[in-house]
């Protein structure tokens, strides 16, 4: 399936607050993510707690061991909601 991508304002604010090394890791992961958000290298997984809270399926991908990007898919649009540590899951 061909996706369009729409980062939210919150995603960009969190991205700009990352260290330069984390930004580099995110850029590398983004190249993979744009090809396939569910590529095995990104370890995409459903976040049950957030999915239940927002009434839609919410996913996260692993960028670094303690850095995740959270997103959902609406029709063919991948909306990247936020990026950060496990605290995003709360």
What are these model-derived regions, one by one?
Residues 11-42:
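N-terminal first-folded block
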């Amino acid at each position: 399936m061909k996706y369009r991508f729409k980062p939210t304002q919150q995603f960009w604010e969190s991205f700009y607050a990352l260290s330069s090394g984390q930004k580099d890791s995110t850029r590398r992961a983004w190249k993979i993510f744009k090809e396939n958000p569910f590529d095995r290298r990104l370890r995409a997984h459903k976040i049950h707690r957030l999915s239940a809270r927002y009434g839609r399926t919410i996913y996260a991908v692993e960028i670094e061991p303690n850095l995740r990007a959270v997103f959902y898919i609406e029709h063919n649009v991948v909306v990247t909601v936020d990026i950060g540590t496990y605290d995003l899951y709360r």
